[in-house]
């Protein structure tokens, strides 16, 4: 009984936090699912969350690759520009805001990250190829981070 009460208390705390953020529980789980799809390192979940929160605040498209992977049949692949143009309510490159629902079953770490994003000004991130990401506040720095990633990828072939 004590464990059930503790578990229910956690649920209500998370629901209160979602309300503080202006999100429904469904929206929190949807955002958490994107974080789950994006984060390879637990230490980056709240930073990735901050990017999405910051984008939502300024009505910027989320441009989340996991949402594209979700709508493409088959195993994950390197995305093409054509993939980014697929017509779907889940395509966060084409649509503003969150997709209609979760794209996977997020773990508790991603749910916590969705509820408690790191306080940053980051608007962009790019994978580094080792599971980590480079986070940036503007498009110029983001393009530079992408350029460096491509150079390093070529070197490591």
Named regions from a protein language model:
Residues 6-157:
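Bacterial extracytoplasmic/cell-wall-associated proteins, especially those involved in peptidoglycan
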């Amino acid at each position: 009984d004590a464990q059930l009460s503790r578990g229910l208390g956690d649920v209500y705390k998370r629901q209160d936090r979602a309300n503080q953020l202006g999100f429904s529980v469904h929206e929190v789980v949807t955002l958490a699912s994107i974080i789950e799809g994006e984060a390879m390192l637990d230490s980056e979940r709240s930073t990735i969350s901050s990017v999405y929160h910051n984008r939502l605040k300024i009505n910027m498209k989320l441009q989340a690759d996991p949402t594209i992977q979700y709508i493409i049949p088959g195993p994950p692949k390197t995305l093409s520009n054509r993939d980014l143009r697929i017509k779907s309510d889940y395509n966060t490159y084409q649509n503003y805001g969150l997709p209609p629902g979760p794209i996977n079953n997020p773990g508790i770490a991603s749910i916590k990250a969705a509820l408690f994003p790191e306080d940053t000004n980051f608007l962009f991130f790019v994978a580094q190829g080792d599971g980590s990401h480079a986070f940036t506040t503007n498009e110029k720095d983001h393009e530079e981070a992408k350029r460096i990633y491509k150079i390093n990828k070529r070197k490591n072939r």
